[in-house]
Amino acid sequence: MSDCIFCKIVAGEIPCDKVYEDKEILGFKDINPKGPVHVLFIPKKHYATLNDIPSSDLSVVGKIFWVIQKVAKEQGVAESGYRTLINTNRNSGQIVFHVHWHLIGGKPLGPMA
């Protein structure tokens, strides 16, 4: 999608601080981190929200969760704890409409509001 900032990152048009990449998934550090570790994971294929991923592409969702736990170990937060989060649509706070998972850790996060 031409106006999607995450699609531009996937295409290499906008730089990112990459922590993981394979043919389907990209993981990179959030530019406005909510903790010492804050990584975003996106499917390289554009889906605006979680609601838009068809059942034929569900394997990428499972793979993203596997990648999140791998990167949590690499970033040193797997044992102390981390949060995974997906915002879906405006009322949840989704700002970039390319589905993405947050991995946040490195400090006590407390309960969700």
Task: Go through each PLM region and give its residues.
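HIT superfamily nucleotide-processing domains
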Residues: 1-113
